[in-house]
Amino acid sequence: REKATVFTAPLPADAAELAFWAKFGFAAEGRQLVRRRTPDLTAVKFVQDFLAARLAQPRLCIDATCGNGGDTAFLCGITAPEGKVVGFDVQEAAIASTRKHLEQLGVPAARYELHCQSHADLLQIVQPGTADAVMFNFGWLPGADHAVFSTAQSSIPALQAALEAVRPGGVVSAILYSGQVIGTDEKQTVLEYLRALPLKSFTVLVCDFANWAETAPLPCIILKK
């Protein structure tokens, strides 16, 4: 369970003011008002929870979009002790950020390898049918220039490579984004591609947050048969 965020405020002496704060979820604890808010389930957490439940001691996992290393670290955490995580990102800043994050967490260097190259080229590094899982978190590098983001032109070939790289029984996950900056082209193109995958070979789950905004991150999961 994710850790709750704690908000505090001075304890008012007036009952009316106390009632006002109660409308916003604050309650008296000792000499202060306290409100605890557990974070909403996020698309990233949803996908991570699914993979953790689905995979038992995977030996080879791929983070196809390293970003700041969150998914890379997650995969290192669920991979078997003798296993390995392979990460890809086209931005050197992302590779450096991921490496720093893993080092801060104390992940042994032998547990992972990072490649500053397109995820569409992952079959140059990974043999077909050998990966237990491949994770994609499309969009842009958090905290970096939003003018640099993934597009359908590279995402579709990367997904094709991932589906070839993963073993039967393995999983490919993809979180799709849309919005004012990146538009809807990648999201719609990827969805069309996923929905056209043959049922005899794949099961595709599109897991939208039905009461969130239309531009909310959209997790997709592909199970290879």
Where are the predicted features?
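Class I S-adenosyl-L-methionine
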Residues: 30-37, 183-225
